[in-house]
Curated annotation (Swiss-Prot):
PANTHER family named in the record: CYTOCHROME B
Annotated function: Component of the ubiquinol-cytochrome c reductase complex (complex III or cytochrome b-c1 complex) that is part of the mitochondrial respiratory chain. The b-c1 complex mediates electron transfer from ubiquinol to cytochrome c. Contributes to the generation of a proton gradient across the mitochondrial membrane that is then used for ATP synthesis.
Positions with a binding annotation for heme b b562: H84, H183
Chief location of this protein within or outside the cell: mitochondrion
Protein name: Cytochrome b
Additional remarks: Heme 1 (or BL or b562) is low-potential and absorbs at about 562 nm, and heme 2 (or BH or b566) is high-potential and absorbs at about 566 nm.
Gene3D superfamilies reported for this sequence: Cytochrome Bc1 Complex, Chain C
Length: 380
């Protein structure tokens, strides 16, 4: 009998088990497409980022001009930059949908996969933050100043830590060069973590919309889901290219077209849209250390999801009370995102505080209560 290389070769066997013969539940919906879309986002960002890095100069006197030079004088440099900048937005759209899917369908009960996923989110946020500093515009500079300054709230070691991160007494050339080094390194850390994420996922297999074991009815990944994934790729790339070609600056801040000036503070310092929910939570607490802790908690609370699961059912498919809470949480996050983009004045302050309070209340208090209530309803 002829040797089947795909199933016997040490390297091809790994690829085969992950992408071709992988047993997959037959009923997973389009919400399960976002994992592979994140893979495409990562590849796109690494390729465009590498091309940008070949023309970029990480020096305070040259960074802004090197980006302008790229957009004007490099073949398709404008397109590569627009794809990279907007690709970051799509990366976050996909990861938020991916996390939302995991939360809705109880995928967090695959604890290792979920925890690695949260670490991936934190790494992605760090990568996006240091990347935003590189063009050295006004919002790059002041964003870096404000966010790195938050570490000074840490008791005793805070100020030392911040000056160590800056490489001086303010955000300056050493900060820019190390941020460029980190921005180059972290995507490869993300690639490594992604492989670990997939390894843990394939230990248990994918969850499905019903939240029940599906071993009795699984189908091979290829050709069924490989085809479905390609449709997802096409749709996302069409949207990304459309945004990059028709409205590349839609999601950016006009302030970043002005070179960084340490002597002039922009009227409203705010991060990119994908950090606004966390920024709103940070601002809603009128104490520096308290705000920093709330900011950290807003993302780290995801680690608690498996511990807060009190329901006898895995997914929210048949849990109407928890469904209402889930969509209230989504609406709450949209409100936080909007408030984060507004100036710190009435009525935005109180709206932000109420939204921040309800964010933590829904996740930490109401979800477990609803689950216990639904368990009791099952006995009626």
């Amino acid at each position: 009998m002829a040797l089947n290389l795909r199933k016997n070769h040490p390297l091809l066997k790994t690829i085969n088990d992950a992408l071709i013969d992988l047993p997959t539940p037959s009923n997973i919906s389009a919400w399960w497409n976002f994992g592979s879309l994140l893979g495409i986002c990562l590849i796109t960002q690494i390729v465009t980022g590498l091309l940008l890095a070949t023309h970029y100069t990480a020096d305070t006197s040259l960074a802004f001009n090197s980006v302008a030079h790229m957009c004007r004088d490099v073949q398709f440099g404008w397109l590569i930059r627009n794809l990279h900048a907007n690709g970051a937005s799509f990366f976050f759209i996909c990861i938020y949908f991916h996390i939302g899917r995991g939360f809705y369908y109880g995928s967090y009960l695959n604890k290792e996969t979920w925890n690695i996923g949260v670490v991936l989110l934190l790494t992605l946020m760090a990568t996006a933050f240091v990347g935003y500093v590189l063009p050295w515009g006004q919002m790059s500079f002041w964003g870096a100043t404000v966010i790195t300054n938050l570490f000074s709230a840490i008791p005793y070691i805070g100020q030392t830590l911040v000056e160590w991160a800056w490489g001086g007494f303010s955000v300056d050339n050493p900060t820019l060069t190390r941020f460029f080094a980190l921005h180059f390194l972290l995507p490869f850390v993300i690639v490594g973590l992604t492989l670990v994420h997939l390894t843990f996922l394939h230990e248990t297999g994918s969850n499905n919309p019903l939240g029940i074991p599906a071993d009795c009815d699984k189908i091979p990944f290829h050709p069924y889901y490989s085809t479905k994934d390609i449709l997802g790729f096409a749709l996302m790339l069409i949207l990304l290219v459309s945004l990059a070609l028709f409205s590349p600056n839609l999601l950016g801040d006009p302030e970043n077209f002005t070179p960084a000036n340490p002597l002039a503070t922009p009227p409203h310092i705010k991060p990119e849209w994908y950090f606004l929910f966390a920024y709103a939570i940070l601002r809603s607490i009128p104490n520096k250390l308290g705000g920093v802790l709330a900011l950290a908690a807003s993302v780290l609370v995801l680690f608690l999801a498996p511990l807060l699961h009190k329901s006898k059912q895995r997914s929210l498919t048949f849990r109407p009370i928890s469904q209402v809470l889930f969509w209230a949480l989504v609406a709450n996050l949209l409100i936080l995102t909007w408030v984060g983009s507004q100036p710190v004045e009435h009525p935005f302050i109180i709206i932000g505080q109420l939204a921040s309070l309800s964010y933590f209340t829904i996740i930490l208090v109401l979800f477990p209560i609803a689950a216990v209530l639904e368990n009791k309803m099952l006995k009626l």
